[in-house]
Design a protein with these regions (language model features):
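Membrane-interfacial terminal anchoring regions of lipid-handling membrane enzymes
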Residues: 1-262
């Protein structure tokens, strides 16, 4: 099977056809990037060294969500439940959720990774592979590992700091996941301004919404709720949403690591 698939991939590369695949190999259960799965990447490099039609460029792509359609499934898996097998009933349940509000999907492109540049860095640019079943030399294995790490780093740099991620970051750090509304709005403004003025990377994108607008947005998505109080309204995470919001918090944690050390 591997030989057939490698040959198929080689034929696609020979025709200069764009290819999409996911470097993590599967969906993250935590919201953080997974260690790279290098199988497809290794086959791509192998095919390139068999016959260089055109230079290969990997375009790291960040995809961020504001709400997960399979949120209940995610929470169950985080609590140790086995992954459910796909079924017709499951598809019908998913279709019924389409009418709900799921916010936006954010797509952002990271710095391109040029394969030929990494081959040169590892002194592997002169290597040629003659056959489909020829093993990958050690230098090329290093190229594959290096390419995978750079792709993941560039995905992280292209992070989109969206309203839901900021809400999650702030409310999950509070006792009982609640905060005075005025203080919450100010905290959101501070974090947004920090991410804007001290960006994680030039490709990082930050929401333009103010703290009050972010709160209104979270209420619209039914991820948080407003609790009336005589001393001032309280913003709290909706029931059973705390575990789910850890996913969105973890999406952006790396962007605040260095500022948190100051």
């Amino acid at each position: 099977y591997t030989s057939v698939f490698k040959e198929y991939l080689y034929s696609i590369l020979s025709r200069n056809t764009p290819i999409e695949y996911f470097i993590e190999g599967g969906r993250s259960r935590t919201g953080r990037l997974l260690p790279p799965k290098t199988g497809m990447l290794a086959m791509t490099v192998h095919g390139h060294l068999r016959g260089r039609a055109k230079p290969i460029v990997f375009l790291p792509t960040y995809i961020g969500y504001e709400r997960l359609m399979e949120g209940s499934t995610y929470v169950g898996e985080m609590q140790g439940k086995p992954k459910e097998a796909e079924s017709i009933f499951g598809i019908v349940k998913t279709l019924r959720k389409i009418e709900r509000i799921f916010g936006k999907v954010h797509v952002n492109f990271g710095e391109p990774v040029f394969l030929d540049d990494i081959l040169k860095q590892h002194n592997a640019d002169k290597i040629q592979i003659e056959k489909n079943d020829a093993p990958i030399p050690a230098e090329v294995s290093n190229v594959v590992s290096s390419s995978a790490n750079v792709i993941l780093e560039n995905i992280n740099r292209a992070v989109v700091i969206n309203p839901v991620s900021l809400l999650s970051l702030i409310l999950l750090a509070t006792p009982k996941h609640t905060l005075d509304e005025e203080i919450c709005a100010k905290q959101l403004d501070i974090y947004r301004d920090l991410a804007t003025q001290q960006p994680y990377d030039e490709r990082t994108q930050v929401t333009s919404l103010s703290g009050k607008e972010i709160i209104a947005y979270g209420l619209k998505l039914k991820l948080i709720k407003r609790v009336q109080h005589v001393l001032g309204d309280i913003i709290a995470i909706e029931d059973n949403q705390a575990v789910l919001l850890t996913y969105f918090r973890n999406n952006i944690l790396h962007a605040f690591v260095l500022p948190s050390l100051v």
